[in-house]
Amino acid sequence: MNYEDVQKVSNAAKAKSNLVNTNFFKYFIRAVMAGFFIDVAMIYSNVVGNVFSKTMPEWGKFVGALVFSIAVLLISFVGGELFTGNNMVMAFGAYDKQVSWKEAGKVWGVSYLGNFVGCAILALLFVGAGASGTADYFAGFIGNKLSIPLGQMFFRAVLCNFFVCLGVLCGMKLKSDAGRFLMIVMSVSYTHLRAHETAANL
């Protein structure tokens, strides 16, 4: 990664910090939208995985992983502020001295809160509409997450952050829509490795 790329990410960090300070509501709504996108991808991924779970579980995991990449694709192409991707962007900005660590922390906090609100709203709508049809879609999935030892959960979260940030970086660096699409899908399909995405766990 050359310094021009570092500067590009650092400038993005400065722009995010400026937006939080000058138009908090706009930034917060962008974070809420990212929460919506995460929920859409998570719900779709789990429903697709459940369809294959009994007959072809290996395909269920693979297709579910591909489907989950919809979240980062939507954020990259439509727009949104995802906490996980902001970890990389704001850290670059802070190390490059384009923003302070305090400013980075503010962006992290607002984006995390916005992601939580977005996930909560869409989850309530999903349950209220009875769209899941049955709790079986998520019962086993949630139980598996809760049974993972703390140490394993931590390292899976680190892996997740790496892969999501890689997808976000590809989305920023590549110019063609086809290239961005392909690299984001390949990067974010980390869910096949049972890594854990921060916002998705909300």
Q: Which functions belong to the PLM regions below?
A:
Residues G130-L150:
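Membrane-interface interhelical connector segments
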Residues R30, A34, K106-G114, G118:
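Alpha-helical transmembrane segments of multi-pass membrane proteins
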Residues T191-T198:
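Conserved small/polar residues in nucleotide/adenosyl-binding loops
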Residues I29-S45:
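The first (N-terminal) embedded transmembrane alpha-helix
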Residues S10-Y27, Q98-V99:
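Cytosolic juxtamembrane amphipathic/interface segments immediately preceding
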Residues N115-T134:
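Transmembrane alpha-helix/helix-exit interface in multi-pass inner-membrane proteins
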Residues F52-V63, G151:
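Interfacial loop-to-helix junctions that mark the boundaries of transmembrane helices
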Residues F162-M186:
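A structural motif at transmembrane helix-loop-helix junctions in multipass membrane proteins
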